[in-house]
Amino acid sequence: MSQDTKYEIMYIIRPNIDEEAKTALVERFDTILKDNGAEVIESKDWEKRRLAYEMNGFREGIYHIVNVTSPSTAGAINEFDRLAKINDDIIRHMIVKVEA
């Protein structure tokens, strides 16, 4: 029996995205996690913040946080990581394993 692992995913969305596109982006990435075996516990916008330094030409971004549990054998985290790297609407992302 594989133990479920808890993860916190934080990603920064470009600030000039319209609300409808942002909602679609968040839903798309939540669905990617669910379809690959993860359970999304919480998915919420944190706030629009100024960045410490310019990234991809932006000085601020919309921070979004997702709390997830996923079996270690599921590819949900790897698939999220792969797709977030190639998405132009996501400036940066970080995946952290939460210790129990």
Curated annotation (Swiss-Prot):
Matches recorded under Gene3D superfamilies: 3.30.70.60
Superkingdom classification of source: Bacteria
Keywords: Ribonucleoprotein, Ribosomal protein, RNA-binding, rRNA-binding
GO MF assignments: small ribosomal subunit rRNA binding; structural constituent of ribosome
SUPFAM superfamilies noted in UniProt: Ribosomal protein S6
Cited InterPro entries: Ribosomal_bS6 (IPR000529), Ribosomal_bS6_sf (IPR035980), Ribosomal_S6_plastid/chlpt (IPR020814), Transl_elong_EF1B/ribsomal_bS6 (IPR014717)
GO cellular component: cytoplasm; ribonucleoprotein complex; ribosome
Entry's Gene Ontology BP terms: translation
HAMAP family, A to Z: Ribosomal_bS6 (MF_00360)
Function field: Binds together with bS18 to 16S ribosomal RNA.
Family according to the record: Belongs to the bacterial ribosomal protein bS6 family.
Name of the protein in question: Small ribosomal subunit protein bS6
UniProt organism field: Enterococcus faecalis (strain ATCC 700802 / V583)
Lineage: Bacteria, Bacillati, Bacillota, Bacilli, Lactobacillales
